[in-house]
């Protein structure tokens, strides 16, 4: 009887150690992913500081408050264009307005209700 109790206790101890190990591995993976996301975000922001005037960055920040998905889409498009060498001069507020309008027009959906 005592051996059975010891065996059960040993199984519980092993299971607990395995769960703790898995938890620590998962936590490390999440921390690494968060670190990589932060690095990518820092790179995106550095590129945006290079290509946008302060007024344009301010406008994009305001758009991010209202429409975060649109702001993210614009950021990624601008970064891609910059990396492809298609942006040769800084983008001011007026140019950013045009870009926002073009992207908004492309992604806007019309809903019609038929009676």
UniProtKB/Swiss-Prot annotation:
Q: Cross-referenced Pfam families, in alphabetical order?
A: dsDNA_bind
Name the InterPro entries on file.
Answer: DNA_bind_arc, PDCD5-like, PDCD5-like_sf
Gene3D superfamilies named among the record's database cross-references: PDCD5-like
An MF annotation (GO) of this entry: DNA binding
Does the record bear DNA-binding in its keywords?
yes
Any keyword Metal-binding?
no
What SUPFAM superfamilies does the record point to? Double-stranded DNA-binding domain
Q: Which GO terms describe its cellular component?
A: cytosol
Keywords per UniProt = DNA-binding
Q: Which family does it belong to?
A: Belongs to the PDCD5 family.
Per its UniProt record, what HAMAP family does this chain match?
Answer: dsDNA_bind (MF_00026)
Query: What NCBIfam families is this protein classified in?
Result: PRK04239.1 (NF003268)
Q: What is this protein called?
A: DNA-binding protein PYRAB09250
